[in-house]
């Protein structure tokens, strides 16, 4: 959980990482190499990592829960980018993660 919040901060607040993420989002359509990097860093790579973590934590339906967990994280990158009140979005993101984790514990 703490790691996911740190990754969100990294991909949204770090100047280099945020610019890199935005560049990959655009360039994925122009180059197979950029598409592969986009998938590796922002889509299938993180989703697979979360799934593996959930398997090791013996969370039920690790693949389904990983998709639910990471999809929310991924969408919040874009919400954050377009928000006037970025602190509010970050808080909403953290609350959403807490809620998902609580639901998975049940």
Residue spans of the language-model regions?
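Short, charge-rich amphipathic segments
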Residues: 2, 24-36, 76-77, 87-94
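Phosphate/oxyanion-binding loops and surfaces in catalytic or ligand/nucleic-acid-binding neighborhoods
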Residues: 10, 14, 27, 31, ...
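Generic serine detector
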Residues: 4-6, 18-19, 31, 44-46, ...
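Hydrophobic alpha-helical connector segments
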Residues: 1-18, 62-69
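Hydrophobic/aromatic-rich alpha-helical bundle segments in the mid-to-C-terminal region
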Residues: 40, 44, 53-104
């Amino acid at each position: 959980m703490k790691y996911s919040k740190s990754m969100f901060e990294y991909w949204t607040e770090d100047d280099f990482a945020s610019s890199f993420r935005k560049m990959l989002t655009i360039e994925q359509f122009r180059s197979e190499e950029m598409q592969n990097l986009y998938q590796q860093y922002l889509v299938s790579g993180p989703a697979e990592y979360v799934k593996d973590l959930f398997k090791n934590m013996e969370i039920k339906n690790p693949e389904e829960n990983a998709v639910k967990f990471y999809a929310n994280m991924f969408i919040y990158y874009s919400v954050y980018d377009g928000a006037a009140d970025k602190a509010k979005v970050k808080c909403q993101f953290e609350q959403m993660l807490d809620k998902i984790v609580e639901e998975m514990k049940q």
